[in-house]
Amino acid sequence: MYDNMSTMVYIKEEKLENVTQDEIISKTKQVIQGLEALKNEHNSILQSLLETLKCLKKDDESNLVEEKSSMIRKSLEMLELGLSEAQVMMALSNHLNAVESEKQNVRAQVRRLCQENQWLRDELANTQQKLQKSEQSVAQLEEEKKHLEFMNQLKKYDDDISPSEDKDSDSSKEPLDDLFPNDEDEPGQGIQHSDSSAAAARQGYEIPARLRTLHNLVIQYASQGRYEVAVPSCKQALEDLEKTSGHDHPDVATMLNILALVYRDQNKYKDAANLLNDALAIREKTLGRDHPAVAATLNNLAVLYGKRGKYKEAEPLCKRALEIREKVLGKDHPDVAKQLNNLALLCQNQGKYEEVEYYYQRALGIYQTKLGPDRTPNVAKTKNNLASCYLKQGKFKQAETLYKEILTRAHEAEFGSVDDENKPIWMHAEEREECKGKQKDGSAFGEYGGWYKACKVDSPTVTTTLKNLGALYRRQGKFEAAETLEEAAMRSRKQGLDNVHKQRVAEVLNDPESMEKRRSRESLNMDVVKYESGPDGGEEA
């Protein structure tokens, strides 16, 4: 019997385990309904018994009714208990459903957070990579900045090249053995080139025409940014020359110079310097240590060292180039003056201002002696450089004197001799300083005294001189005079830019082929071997 009962209980438990939660809820609701019905029925019976009990006297029958009433009350209590338990089960079920729903929501939120976490990890990894690349770029840009600062000092002009100087330039006259031509565009340039070329010819080497042609092609490709054509062309020509003439041949050295030019344009200064060192060794071996081509290579090598900030290493190379040019051309040759300018700026970058002053003064003496009047561009540029050197040393009076000389010569070249009615702009500026606040008619100084006409002089050297002298006036507290010169410099620069733009537009419209050739020459001229700082060879105060 007990075995049968245990088996029945086990079967019932197994059945309960197989019942789903929804079925349990449904059956519980049915049980609640049944219990409610029983409760109502028992209440009715109890009321009936109580009414009956009131009508009966105390006897056996009334005792029986009381006993039945007591049983009904117990049944009602059990029904109440069953209803309470059923309601608790329903509440528990609702709570479990809510918990399950919350659980699903939490799981969904966890999945979303996991996805967001993965996305943030990916973003962090990408950001770290970008940061690393940015740091590398910053380091590279710092190096490039140093190079560009020095290149700015090497350039004869910036992109605002004077139209009159553009007109005088002639790339066909540039000596090919100078990787970066260091001769400035000026009258008499052809004579200087012929002197240099003649000196080279007397010492037994002349650059073949085919290499000159290749050089011009490479310059054209480089100006167009087509290095993928220029570099293989140079390397192939170099390989052919080494096969036919051997490595130690002047033509090979020339080809190395041309390839170094391309590397220089790509900012590969170290590779370009290696090529120039090789070219220098070949030229010293084949042409002799005192050949003009050796001087040119030394000069170009000094420039590349300078672009890398190695001024100390560049200085002896520049000095040796100066010695060779003095020996070959004479100590008073204009090319020697140019080399002195280069050497002066190298010393300036090292803070050797006494040597800078000496080199600039000597170069100025050569220019004034050999190039004639005091109005040549080289004289003005060298005076500007010397004035900048004076500023560095605190010799403000000497600098002011030179700046005034430059402006006076420029004014005379444009408007004739100076007199009471025809004064250079610095005189008008000082008059304005003396008379500030005293104009009787209240007219703007832009129309006063005719000083604004000096703005027609659009030489970059004059523009820089105006800025520097204006800064010097400010240092002296002459603010009205400074504003006069600064306004003139601004007008001069704007007029120069407008003229250059008009000329280039006209060239493109009239002769595109000529324009392309001019660009090729311009790319050469913009990288002249000289260490003058600023767009026109003078460092602004």
Curated annotation (Swiss-Prot):
Disulfide bonds, paired cysteine numbers: none
Keyword Ligase: no
Region described as Disordered: 156-201, 493-541
GO cellular component: axon; ciliary rootlet; cytoplasm; cytoplasmic vesicle; cytosol; growth cone; kinesin complex; microtubule
PROSITE patterns from the UniProt entry: KINESIN_LIGHT, TPR, TPR_REGION
Primary location class: other
Record's keyword terms, sorted: Calcium, Cell adhesion, Cell projection, Coiled coil, Cytoplasm, Cytoplasmic vesicle, Cytoskeleton, Microtubule, Motor protein, Phosphoprotein, Repeat, TPR repeat
Sequence positions bearing Phosphoserine: 162, 459, 520, 523
A GO BP entry: axo-dendritic transport
InterPro entries in alphabetical order: Kinesin_light (IPR002151), TPR-like_helical_dom_sf (IPR011990), TPR_rpt (IPR019734)
UniProt feature coiled coil, ranges: 27-156
Subcellular location(s) per record: Cell projection, Growth cone; Cytoplasmic vesicle; Cytoplasm, Cytoskeleton
Record SUPFAM superfamilies: TPR-like
Record-linked Pfam families: TPR_10, TPR_12
Biased composition (Basic and acidic residues): 156-176, 495-505, 514-524
PTM comment text: Phosphorylation at Ser-459 by ERK inhibits interaction with CLSTN1 and localization to cytoplasmic vesicles.
The organism's place on the tree of life at top rank: Eukaryota
Record flagged with keyword Cell inner membrane: no
Spans of repeat TPR: 211-244, 253-286, 295-328, 337-370, 380-413, 463-496
Residue positions where Phosphotyrosine is found in the record: 448
Complexes and interactors: Oligomeric complex composed of two heavy chains and two light chains. Interacts with SPAG9. Interacts with ATCAY; may link mitochondria to KLC1 and regulate mitochondria localization into neuron projections. Interacts (via TPR repeats) with TOR1A; the interaction associates TOR1A with the kinesin oligomeric complex. Interacts with BORCS5. Interacts with MAPK8IP3/JIP3 and NTRK2/TRKB; interaction with NTRK2/TRKB is mediated by MAPK8IP3/JIP3. Interacts with CLSTN1; phosphorylation at Ser-459 inhibits interaction with CLSTN1.
Task of the protein: Kinesin is a microtubule-associated force-producing protein that may play a role in organelle transport. The light chain may function in coupling of cargo to the heavy chain or in the modulation of its ATPase activity.
Family: Belongs to the kinesin light chain family.
Protein name: Kinesin light chain 1
Organism: Mus musculus
Origin organism lineage: Eukaryota, Metazoa, Chordata, Craniata, Vertebrata
